[in-house]
A protein has these predicted regions:
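Basic- and aromatic-enriched surface patches that contact anionic nucleotides/nucleic acids
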Residues: 1-24, 116-156
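Short alpha-helix boundary/capping and kink motifs at helix termini
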Residues: 5-6, 58-123, 134, 140
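Low-complexity, compositionally biased segments
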Residues: 19, 24, 35, 59, ...
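Compositionally biased, low-structure terminal segments
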Residues: 48, 53, 74, 81-84, ...
Length: 156
């Protein structure tokens, strides 16, 4: 990930489809959801690359896990994440910004994590993680027992 900012300047004028095609070719080991949400949408987001610079994405694999409601609260936010508001006031706007919670009982977009210091840390989806926690804390609507997250691990 150390060279991602250099690559940003080469890719910044491409549309999302062209960026997807590029990243699919470079990282065939990553699925489309991870490529889109993590690489295409965050292309040029320097603080993401700095915090997780130890990852060599070409040597990583992605594992899908289902976590319980309690386990969702054990995931740490990335250091760069400054907005961690999980209050009822924030929950009250979820109906407008994330209505899929009320249909599915979980978040349907990917939350990408990686192990650090024996904990999972959100690389991508910090806001989705916050909204999911908000929903779990404050809703009277149905809640799923399990929530899908992704863990990116580096092969040794």
């Amino acid at each position: 990930m150390k060279n991602m900012m250099k690559k940003y300047y080469e890719l910044q004028n491409l549309n999302d489809k062209e960026k997807m095609d590029y990243f699919r070719a470079v990282y065939p080991n990553l699925n489309d959801n991870i490529i889109y949400y993590f690489l295409v949408r965050h292309l040029g987001t320097e603080f993401v690359y700095e915090e997780f610079s130890q990852l060599n994405l070409s040597k990583c694999y992605v594992e899908e896990l289902e976590l319980s409601n309690n386990q969702i609260f054990e995931i740490e936010y990335a250091d760069f994440c400054s907005f961690k508001n999980e209050t009822v006031q924030y929950y009250n706007i979820l109906n407008e910004v994330a209505p899929n919670y009320f249909i599915t009982g979980t978040w349907t977009g990917p939350i990408l994590t990686t192990p650090r210091n024996n904990k999972l840390v959100a690389i991508d989806g910090n806001n989705r993680l916050r909204m999911l926690r908000c929903y779990l804390k404050h809703t009277n609507m149905p809640i799923c027992d399990k929530h899908r997250i992704y863990v990116i691990r580096q092969n040794d």
